[in-house]
Amino acid sequence: MATQNVDSGHEDMVHDAQFDYYGKFLATCSSDKMIKIFDVGGENPQHLVDLRGHEGPVWQVAWAHPKFGKILASASYDRKVIVWKEVGNNSWSIIHQYAGHELSVNSISWAPHEFGLSLACASSDGSVTIHNYNNNVWEAPQKIQVSQIGVNSVSWSPAAIPTSLVNSANTIIPAPIKRIVTGSCDNLIKIFKNVEDKWILDKQLEDHKDWVRDVAWAPNIGLPYSKIASCSQDRSVIVWTQDENGVWSGKPLPKFDDIVWRVSWSVIGNILAVSCGDNQVTLWKEGVDSEWKLISHVENN
């Protein structure tokens, strides 16, 4: 695949860039308070529109599944979460806005589309809010108190049930349970599950020695386990695996040379991308011996 360079046109640091579901559109956000959308489906990227609505640096953007239309969420230092929707050709409107967090909103994550249009938002105030759209109305958000200090990242579990690929044809597969994982400034990873429309703490994972900067739940194609990647200010990445008995165990990757800011899984969950503060991105894959091995290395200039 040929590499494309996109001149974002932002006037300050770019904090996030996300492709839509089909890889045709790219959204970027910046400390200049702006969100920009580009058409990258052709040979030359084309800037389409600027979205203005935030009053501070915009940390993250996230595309919803296309079954709901062309919808983009954004999170900002201004304590606001905004959900945008394209209502005409390059014409976007705000369809939901929430300013109830007391401090910066650091991370946002859309639920798998099987769970409906649902957005999780993690904040420096120590909470995560869940925003659900039902019956043409945005419901009052559900609030989860995660930590006494800030939450840096949130990620949804996939809707696929572990072991569904290997179960026999006569096995009754239970409905998936809504779960999220968070990473916070108390060095902890916490997993919450939704039981009778209430979010309860399911598991706490404790191996990091400094702030957890990012968490990412791996896609699941029906194999008999779940995986979560976490990264930290302590320069470590840990891949957590939940076995068939529900027990979580962590496997650390080799120590990195700088703070690890982001982790991201490939579409089928077999390759992990790791982004560090020294501008290096590395790709890792689990071997047959269950050890994670470096398969590619990219240094950004």
Curated annotation (Swiss-Prot):
<feature type="repeat" description="WD 5">
    <location>
        <begin position="207"/>
        <end position="250"/>
    </location>
</feature>
<comment type="similarity">
    <text>Belongs to the WD repeat SEC13 family.</text>
</comment>
<keyword id="KW-0539">Nucleus</keyword>
<dbReference type="GO" id="GO:0005765">
    <property type="term" value="C:lysosomal membrane"/>
</dbReference>
<dbReference type="GO" id="GO:0005789">
    <property type="term" value="C:endoplasmic reticulum membrane"/>
</dbReference>
<feature type="repeat" description="WD 6">
    <location>
        <begin position="255"/>
        <end position="294"/>
    </location>
</feature>
<keyword id="KW-0472">Membrane</keyword>
<dbReference type="InterPro" id="IPR037363">
    <property type="entry name" value="Sec13/Seh1_fam"/>
</dbReference>
<feature type="repeat" description="WD 1">
    <location>
        <begin position="9"/>
        <end position="48"/>
    </location>
</feature>
<comment type="subunit">
    <text>Component of the COPII coat composed of at least 5 proteins: the sec23/24 complex, the sec13/31 complex, and the protein sar1A or sar1B. Component of the nuclear pore complex (NPC) which constitutes the exclusive means of nucleocytoplasmic transport. Probably part of the GATOR complex.</text>
</comment>
<feature type="repeat" description="WD 4">
    <location>
        <begin position="146"/>
        <end position="202"/>
    </location>
</feature>
<dbReference type="GO" id="GO:0006606">
    <property type="term" value="P:protein import into nucleus"/>
</dbReference>
<keyword id="KW-0931">ER-Golgi transport</keyword>
<dbReference type="GO" id="GO:0032008">
    <property type="term" value="P:positive regulation of TOR signaling"/>
</dbReference>
<dbReference type="InterPro" id="IPR036322">
    <property type="entry name" value="WD40_repeat_dom_sf"/>
</dbReference>
<dbReference type="Pfam" id="PF00400">
    <property type="entry name" value="WD40"/>
</dbReference>
<dbReference type="GO" id="GO:0005643">
    <property type="term" value="C:nuclear pore"/>
</dbReference>
<keyword id="KW-0458">Lysosome</keyword>
<feature type="repeat" description="WD 3">
    <location>
        <begin position="100"/>
        <end position="141"/>
    </location>
</feature>
<dbReference type="InterPro" id="IPR015943">
    <property type="entry name" value="WD40/YVTN_repeat-like_dom_sf"/>
</dbReference>
<dbReference type="GO" id="GO:0005198">
    <property type="term" value="F:structural molecule activity"/>
</dbReference>
<dbReference type="GO" id="GO:0030127">
    <property type="term" value="C:COPII vesicle coat"/>
</dbReference>
<feature type="repeat" description="WD 2">
    <location>
        <begin position="53"/>
        <end position="94"/>
    </location>
</feature>
<keyword id="KW-0813">Transport</keyword>
<comment type="function">
    <text>Component of the coat protein complex II (COPII) which promotes the formation of transport vesicles from the endoplasmic reticulum (ER). The coat has two main functions, the physical deformation of the endoplasmic reticulum membrane into vesicles and the selection of cargo molecules. It also functions as a component of the nuclear pore complex (NPC). NPC components, collectively referred to as nucleoporins (NUPs), can play the role of both NPC structural components and of docking or interaction partners for transiently associated nuclear transport factors.</text>
</comment>
<keyword id="KW-0653">Protein transport</keyword>
<dbReference type="GO" id="GO:0006888">
    <property type="term" value="P:endoplasmic reticulum to Golgi vesicle-mediated transport"/>
</dbReference>
<keyword id="KW-0677">Repeat</keyword>
<keyword id="KW-0906">Nuclear pore complex</keyword>
<keyword id="KW-0853">WD repeat</keyword>
<dbReference type="GO" id="GO:0032527">
    <property type="term" value="P:protein exit from endoplasmic reticulum"/>
</dbReference>
<comment type="function">
    <text>As a component of the GATOR complex may function in the amino acid-sensing branch of the TORC1 signaling pathway.</text>
</comment>
<dbReference type="GO" id="GO:0051028">
    <property type="term" value="P:mRNA transport"/>
</dbReference>
<dbReference type="GO" id="GO:0031080">
    <property type="term" value="C:nuclear pore outer ring"/>
</dbReference>
<dbReference type="GO" id="GO:0090114">
    <property type="term" value="P:COPII-coated vesicle budding"/>
</dbReference>
<keyword id="KW-0256">Endoplasmic reticulum</keyword>
<keyword id="KW-0811">Translocation</keyword>
<keyword id="KW-0509">mRNA transport</keyword>
<dbReference type="InterPro" id="IPR001680">
    <property type="entry name" value="WD40_rpt"/>
</dbReference>
<protein>
    <recommendedName>
        <fullName>Protein SEC13 homolog</fullName>
    </recommendedName>
</protein>
<keyword id="KW-0968">Cytoplasmic vesicle</keyword>
